[in-house]
């Protein structure tokens, strides 16, 4: 029996996530009142067939009933009902933009203030986030990328106990990824920004990757990084960790970080690990140092 509780911040993508879970064969329920959680779990565990995999959304829309969630989770544990929590997060800036684009008000907004609503919701969800087995930061994820992450966790992830590794390239000027487990600074590597023919390209272009990796320091660093990650992965798997987010940053997130992300991605893929790669800032830094 697979029982997934999807929660997180308003505007972070829970409605989209539950649709994808349905595509993956889960029986899905959106906005279940927390007071009904234990009874619903009992029905699911007594059922067979389509109820063998269940995903449901519980969030702040439950209003006053949301306060009952923790007691409901305790009752589920006492009854022997196993569950896991998926928490969807995003930056304040991204959430505000999404609310403005959809012209919706935040469910906890005071006098229509979206930032105040987000801050209040973060505080209310802080303890729940700590209980989550999986946390997905959707700040820079397109819809298809969210589906890919969910697929790796809840479809491919069921096929083995291997770690799911997410490699994120980024620019320090845009901030470190919120969900990073490991952060590597590659601003000491040769910068293609100063080469006129490469300035407007990114590490997704072979010319840029060749320029960066032709430097002995880049090769040496890459080899040492590969060795370190190869050493760490079995340790994380042994302690039961199922997601590892490796963030690689340069100045603008355009050239060097993207290049090293590609090299590490290929290295891990060749060794059979399940790896995702996301170049968070590669399209934000055109014409800036990267």
From Swiss-Prot:
ATP binds at residues 8-15. Keywords: ATP-binding, GTP-binding, Nucleotide-binding. The keyword Nucleotide-binding applies. Pfam families: PapZ_C, RapZ-like_N. GTP binds at residues 59-62. One of its GO terms (molecular function) is ATP binding. Displays ATPase and GTPase activities. HAMAP family: RapZ_like (MF_00636). Belongs to the RapZ-like family. This is Nucleotide-binding protein Clos_0574.
């Amino acid at each position: 029996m697979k029982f997934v509780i999807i929660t997180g911040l308003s505007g972070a993508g829970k409605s989209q996530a539950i649709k994808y879970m349905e595509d993956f064969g889960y029986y899905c329920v959106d906005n279940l009142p927390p007071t009904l959680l234990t009874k619903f779990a009992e029905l699911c565990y007594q059922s067979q067939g389509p109820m063998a995999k269940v995903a449901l959304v519980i969030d702040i829309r439950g209003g006053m009933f949301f306060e009952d969630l923790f007691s409901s989770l305790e009752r589920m544990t006492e009854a022997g009902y196993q569950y896991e929590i998926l928490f969807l997060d995003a930056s304040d800036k991204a959430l505000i933009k999404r609310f403005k684009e959809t012209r919706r008000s935040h469910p906890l907004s005071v006098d229509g203030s979206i930032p105040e609503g987000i801050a209040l919701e973060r505080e209310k969800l802080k303890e729940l986030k700590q209980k989550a087995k999986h946390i997905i930061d959707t700040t820079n994820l397109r819809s298809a990328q969210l589906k890919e992450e969910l697929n790796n966790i809840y479809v491919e992830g069921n096929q083995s106990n291997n770690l799911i590794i997410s490699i994120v390239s980024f620019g320090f000027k845009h901030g470190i990824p919120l969900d990073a487990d490991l952060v590597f600074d590659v601003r000491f590597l040769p910068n293609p920004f100063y080469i006129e023919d490469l300035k407007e390209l990114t590490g997704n272009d072979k010319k840029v990757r060749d320029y960066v990796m032709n430097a002995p320091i880049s090769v040496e660093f890459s080899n040492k990084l590969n060795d370190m990650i190869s050493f760490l992965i079995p340790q994380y798997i042994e302690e039961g960790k199922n997601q590892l987010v490796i963030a690689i940053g340069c100045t603008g997130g355009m050239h060097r970080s993207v290049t090293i992300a590609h090299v590490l991605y290929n290295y891990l893929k060749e060794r059979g690990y399940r790896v995702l790669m996301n170049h968070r800032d590669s399209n934000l830094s055109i014409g800036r140092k990267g």
